[in-house]
Amino acid sequence: MDQLANHFKSHIAELNHRVAEIISRENLSGLVIHSGQPHRQFLDDMDYPFKVNPHFKAWLPILDNPHCWLLVNGRDKPQLIFYRPVDFWHKVADLPDAFWAEHVEIKLLTKADKVAELLPSDISQWAYIGEHLDVAEVLGFKTRNPDAVMSYLHYHRASKTQYELCCLRNANEIAVKGHLAAKNAFFNGGSEFEIQQEYLTATNQGENEVPYGNIVALNENAAILHYTKLESVRPESRHSFLIDAGANFFGYASDITRTYAFEKNIFSELIEAMDKMQQEIISMMRPGVKYVDLHIATHQKLAKILVDFDIASGEPQSLVDQGITNVFFPHGLGHMLGLQVHDMGGFLHDERGTHIAAPDAHPFLRCTRTLAANQVLTIEPGIYIIDSLLNELKQDSRKKQVNWQTVDLLRPFGGIRIEDNVIVHADQNENMTRDCGLN
């Protein structure tokens, strides 16, 4: 925690610098960042789990307290309007006394609808940053989530401060504990639901605290890219296990995937080949490299694996050009990682918000940035037996290049994905996931 405290001052200074720059350009007095407010379930008296505005938690690790506000102008000490009602129904947030509290001026808000009394008397030149535009309108904000401000902040969010890198390392360390527990639960015969519980216990995080819904998939369920059902019944046969699960630390996310074979067989050999390929792609990461080029290189390497394992036949580059590799690897190589699992700014190529879309041949790629120091990205190649995509391929001449016997052999295993979280440094890569002991 001492290391975080030491880095926090410079983190706030960097955020202040960014705000000062953009509000000067846009002739604004400052930004009013809303933590958010609860969403009530339809026809009920309960709220959905609260998720804080990522722009708010960029400044302060306050994740579970709605109706808070942050006033920043890049010059003065940030002002935190901290919601602390009189409430005998719910737990009221404690007064802030963590290491970060000395870096903000704190005002207490006891009634959410009285916040106007604590806002600047003239907010005509202040911009509201948040989800609840109706609230902003009632309060009199004329400028709400202006495009120029949002693009600027999202573009620069890709460059992580030392405080943020520390948070991301901690998020990886926590998640690795969960992954090791989940692996053990798989080999001990656990159901998907039981494996999930072991993961959550090891990370000491509830399902509403982890940054996304964990994917815990046994056997053919591993072919479903965003599988979150969690079967409670143990399968009769145990072939494979894919887990895509992260952890949260101070609002920063880890996002890690591993795949395991229950026995030594062609699938376990395929996992080894995919792991080797993933490490080769990570070794190619450096400032100045385009993420799109890494994605294309992954398809070229995957094509060779398809041939080596007699899943497909032909020249590897031809398999890429014909879109055959897309059938087995339909998603993107990865994405930016930070305050959000799919962090903002992956398509922005300047601070004005110039958008460069994914290539037409790879529409699901979530990042087209050129790599730079202090960026954090995931690298997550995969190979899957997805019947809906294979059925489309069967409708044309490409079907002759697929060995359907091998496909049938692999179908019960579902698929493979291996995902690490990597920091790009000026002269090296830092694989946080592997450094935390998950191989």
Curated annotation (Swiss-Prot):
Keywords recorded for this protein, A-Z: Dipeptidase, Hydrolase, Manganese, Metal-binding, Metalloprotease, Protease
Molecular function GO labels: aminopeptidase activity; metal ion binding; metalloexopeptidase activity; phosphoric triester hydrolase activity; proline dipeptidase activity
Family statement drawn from the similarity comment of this UniProt entry: Belongs to the peptidase M24B family. Bacterial-type prolidase subfamily.
List of residues binding Mn(2+) 2: D244, D255, E419
Pfam families the record matches: PepQ_N, Peptidase_M24
HAMAP family hit by this protein: X_Pro_dipeptid
PROSITE patterns, A to Z: PROLINE_PEPTIDASE
GO biological process: proteolysis
GO cellular component: cytosol
Chain's role: Splits dipeptides with a prolyl residue in the C-terminal position.
EC numbers, comma separated: 3.4.13.9
Gene giving rise to this polypeptide: pepQ
Name of protein: Xaa-Pro dipeptidase
Entry's cofactor comment: Binds 2 manganese ions per subunit.
Coiled coil: none
Catalytic EC class: hydrolase
SUPFAM superfamilies: Creatinase/aminopeptidase (SSF55920)
Taxonomic placement: Bacteria, Pseudomonadati, Pseudomonadota, Gammaproteobacteria, Alteromonadales
Catalyses which reaction(s): Xaa-L-Pro dipeptide + H2O = an L-alpha-amino acid + L-proline
Binding site residues for Mn(2+) 1: D255, H335, E380, E419
PANTHER family reported in the protein's UniProt record: XAA-PRO AMINOPEPTIDASE 3, XAA-PRO DIPEPTIDASE
Cofactor field: Mn(2+)
